[in-house]
């Protein structure tokens, strides 16, 4: 194992280096952020005009 992968958890070190791990972190957090924004938007639209009886 490489010693320069200090940000990567030990079980993921064979797959990721630090740069890959940081990019993965950005992608995952962006996906979660999008999901939260989408859920809030759906809730607001449902409160405005319910689409289920």
Curated annotation (Swiss-Prot):
InterPro entries (alphabetical): Antenna_a/b (IPR000066), Antenna_beta_CS (IPR023623), Antenna_beta_dom_sf (IPR023624), LHB-1/5 (IPR002362), Light-harvesting_complex (IPR035889)
Topology of the protein relative to the lipid bilayer: Single-pass type II membrane protein
Transport as UniProt keyword: no
Key word Transmembrane present: yes
GO MF terms held by the record: bacteriochlorophyll binding; electron transporter, transferring electrons within the cyclic electron transport pathway of photosynthesis activity; metal ion binding
Keywords, alphabetical: Antenna complex, Bacteriochlorophyll, Cell membrane, Chlorophyll, Chromophore, Formylation, Light-harvesting polypeptide, Magnesium, Membrane, Metal-binding, Transmembrane, Transmembrane helix
Primary subcellular site in the record, as a coarse category: membrane
Cytoplasmic side: 1-25
Modified residues (N-formylmethionine): 1
PROSITE patterns linked: ANTENNA_COMP_BETA
Compartment(s) where it occurs, according to its Swiss-Prot or TrEMBL record: Cell membrane
NCBIfam families: pufB_517_ASD
Function: Antenna complexes are light-harvesting systems, which transfer the excitation energy to the reaction centers.
The name this protein goes by in its record: Light-harvesting protein B-808/866 beta chain
């Amino acid at each position: 194992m490489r010693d320069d992968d200090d940000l990567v958890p030990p079980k993921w070190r064979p797959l990721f280096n630090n740069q890959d791990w940081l990019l993965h972190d950005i992608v995952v957090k962006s996906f979660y952020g999008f999901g939260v924004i989408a859920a809030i938007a759906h809730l607001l639209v449902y409160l405005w005009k319910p689409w289920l009886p």
